[in-house]
């Protein structure tokens, strides 16, 4: 239950019009009965209802709300899973906004792996995504390089990634 509350506080700090109470109440409705991944999806869907309809504005707010230090330990006891809903938000709502979503995944993966998100982009925008991942494979940040490795393994169980021309 701390994850939705923490996300609400983070967003409200940079977007004062954010309705924390409604977001938290909606996110926590049925929350305890859900597994971890389902909780992440539920919060991501509530973000869609609580942030501006304009995806690019919503992503700007989400990214602005992140702690300034891009360390996986910033979430304290929650671990990086605090950022799982952010990754799911990009996966679900950003497919038609390639550049904005790539920027978001680049930033987010430095806090929590964006592998769950990048796979949808490999399916929808295979050539452009592979090109970007090729650039990222030489990035100075190890988390970005790890995304390239983890996000392009289609045969792992539970990846949800169908066969691509390169697999």
Predicted feature descriptions by range:
Residues 1-167:
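Surface-facing alpha-helical segments and adjacent helix-coil boundary elements at the starts of domains
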